[in-house]
Amino acid sequence: MANPLYHKHIISINDLSRDELELVLRTAASLKKTPQPELLKHKVIASCFFEASTRTRLSFETSIHRLGASVVGFSDSSNTSLGKKGETLADTMSVISTYVDAIVMRHPQEGASRLAAQFSGNVPIVNAGDGANQHPTQTLLDLFTIQETQGRLDNINIAMVGDLKYGRTVHSLTQALAKFNGNRFFFIAPDALAMPAYILQMLEEKEIEYSLHESLEEVVPELDILYMTRVQKERLDPSEYANVKAQFILRSSDLTGARDNLKVLHPLPRIDEITTDVDKTPYAYYFQQAGNGIFARQALLALVLNAELAL
């Protein structure tokens, strides 16, 4: 069966329909159950990270190797022609696209991946994060984890806590879950880091229920998923960071009265916002969530680079 993601740029989670999201998740589940070590044999994929990353970069590169493909690229753009000689991003992508079958790209500038897609010819760009904008593959692994732990993606009560202004993961995840039915959102953040107005407007236009809170305690008993985020020091001025960094911290005592099926997720890295005593509770699932990134990213790359895929 022809697959609709073949050679498709994956820039925003909004580039994927509900059917396409479900296709990726089915493929991820299949790859988790039955590895396919030669699925992308003879393919070459560029890993271009213009911004620091540990989990996302290593997860992508591991995914590439486990599918039998080769990976080339860089994790520090300061040593590239773009960083040292002033080459434009457009020229950099125009050249790299002549070497490889796909490009995985992270960049600090919002919209950089979509710009790159204009200059990569028929070589698909996979956005691994562009500034505070989008992080679609994190969203895919989040969806995969929610489905794995809850058995569904409809009728989920989810709280998102912390930095909802600059946290691209919560923007993408809210947009993705809005494609499913009956989901309810609880947004818990200080005013300075509130969910952007365009996300709230999208929910209102779709008549999706959401509420704003200043306390985690009042919503925990209603939740299926508690999605914690860190305050992003690199995107705040020092005075603002100092004011908000410790405002929302999850401790195991905060989970008293939680539903049995509750899972605590976090895109990582964790700084102060989840204390280590939470790790020992049955609710903690953030390390397994990170591990699911391998299968979600394998699935996406396999679909983007195979005209027909039946697993």
Swiss-Prot record:
In the Enzyme Commission scheme, what number(s) does this protein have?
A: 2.1.3.2
Keywords from the named record:
Pyrimidine biosynthesis, Transferase
Give a GO molecular function annotation for the protein. Answer: amino acid binding
Recorded hits in Gene3D superfamilies, A to Z, give: Aspartate/ornithine carbamoyltransferase (3.40.50.1370)
Q: Which family does it belong to?
A: Belongs to the aspartate/ornithine carbamoyltransferase superfamily. ATCase family.
Q: Which PANTHER family match?
A: ASPARTATE CARBAMOYLTRANSFERASE (PTHR45753:SF6), ORNITHINE CARBAMOYLTRANSFERASE, MITOCHONDRIAL (PTHR45753)
**Assembly, per entry:** Heterododecamer (2C3:3R2) of six catalytic PyrB chains organized as two trimers (C3), and six regulatory PyrI chains organized as three dimers (R2).
Instruction: Kindly provide the name given to this protein in its UniProt entry.
Output: Aspartate carbamoyltransferase catalytic subunit
Source organism per entry reads Yersinia pseudotuberculosis serotype O:1b (strain IP 31758)
